[in-house]
Amino acid sequence: MITRKTLSLNFLKPVLELEYQIDQLSKMTYKNKSLNIHDLTALKKQLIKIKIEIFQSLTPLQRLHLVRQVDRPTTLDYIGHILDDWIELHGDRGGTDDPALIGGLGKINNRTVVCIGHQRGKDTKDNVLRNFGMASPGGYRKALRLMKHANRFNFPILTFIDTPGAWAGVDAERLGQGEAIAVNLREMFSFNVPIICTIIGEGGSGGALGIGVGDKVLMLEDAVYTVATPEACAAILWKDSKQSLEAAEALKITSYDLKALGIIDDIVEEPLGGSQEDSLLASHILHSKLVTELNYLLSLSSDKLKELRIPKIRRMGTFYEG
C-alpha cells in the first residue's frame, strides 16, 4: 500500500479506501494461504479502473491541488534519478545562496549539463527552509551565474520549474526581484547552448518565467502553468477566493490547454495516479524525453537555436479578443 504523507484530497478518497482494503487483504492472504487470491486480484483491477476514471476527468483546480502535495517528486528527486555525477553548486557571488532555487552540474547519457530548478520542502521544517519553493532575487542571480557558466563551457541547460511564484516579500522587492527575473529572461534569449525547461509541478507567474525561457518547454501531464494562482485571480476579479474553480477553468492552466495554445511544446506522460505514485517510473519517462529533445537540439547550430528561440517565446504573448 502507498503511504500518504498528507491528508488525502477529497477526489482521491475512493482510491485510498481501495488501497486500504487491498493492503488488509494482502496481509490476511500472506498469513493464511487458503484465502481466495482472486478477491485480491479483483480489487486491484477495480483500483486501476477507478484511478483511470478519476485522473481522466480531473478539473484544472484538482490538478493544482494534486501537484501541491508534498509527496510529489521535487527537483532533487528527479535529479537523483536522471543525472549521474551530480554536484550542487552554491551562491550567487553576491552574498546569498537561496535554497529555494538549486543548481549544479551532472551528466545525462554521459553528456555534462547544468541543471537548475525550484526546490520545495518535504515537510513543514524543510518548506520553511526552502521558502516553499519561492525563490529570492539571489536565487535567480545564482541561476543566472550557473547558466552563464554553462554557456561559457558549452554545457546544455536543463531547468525544472516548480513554484507558486517568486518570493513577493518586501525584502525581495528591495533586493530587486523584478530586475533579477527580467535579466534572466534577457540573458536566456542570448545563450548559445540548448535550453530545455520542464514544468514538473506548479509553474507560477514570473517565478516560473525566471528560469523558463527554453528551446523546448515540456510539461508533466498533471502539472499546471499560470500567470496567477486561481485563488489570487478570483480574489482580484471577483473579490472572492471561493470563485477559484471558475478562475482555474478560465486561466487554462493544464498541460492539455497549454499545448493547444502553443505555450508548451510537449506533454510528458505521468504514471497512473500522478508522479507521486511512482517517482522512479516518472523519472524514467522524463529522462527518455529529455534525451530525445537534447539530441535534436544538439544537432542545431547556436545561431539556429537563437533564431528559433526568440520568436517562439515572443509568440506566448499573442492573444485574441472575442
Curated annotation (Swiss-Prot):
Bilayer-crossing regions: none
Listed InterPro entries: Acetyl_CoA_COase_a_su (IPR001095), ClpP/crotonase-like_dom_sf (IPR029045), COA_CT_C (IPR011763)
Localization, UniProt: Plastid, Chloroplast
Signal sequence bounds: none
Cellular compartments per GO CC: acetyl-CoA carboxylase complex; chloroplast
GO annotation, biological process: fatty acid biosynthetic process; malonyl-CoA biosynthetic process
PROSITE patterns for the chain: COA_CT_CTER
Catalyzed reactions per annotation: N(6)-carboxybiotinyl-L-lysyl-[protein] + acetyl-CoA = N(6)-biotinyl-L-lysyl-[protein] + malonyl-CoA
Domain CoA carboxyltransferase C-terminal: 39-296
Keyword line: ATP-binding, Chloroplast, Fatty acid biosynthesis, Fatty acid metabolism, Lipid biosynthesis, Lipid metabolism, Nucleotide-binding, Plastid, Transferase
EC number(s) on file: 2.1.3.15
One Pfam family here: ACCA
GO molecular function, a single term: ATP binding
Family listed: Belongs to the AccA family.
Subunit text: Acetyl-CoA carboxylase is a heterohexamer composed of biotin carboxyl carrier protein (accB), biotin carboxylase (accC) and two subunits each of ACCase subunit alpha (accA) and ACCase subunit beta (accD).
Protein known as: Acetyl-coenzyme A carboxylase carboxyl transferase subunit alpha
Originating species: Antithamnion sp.
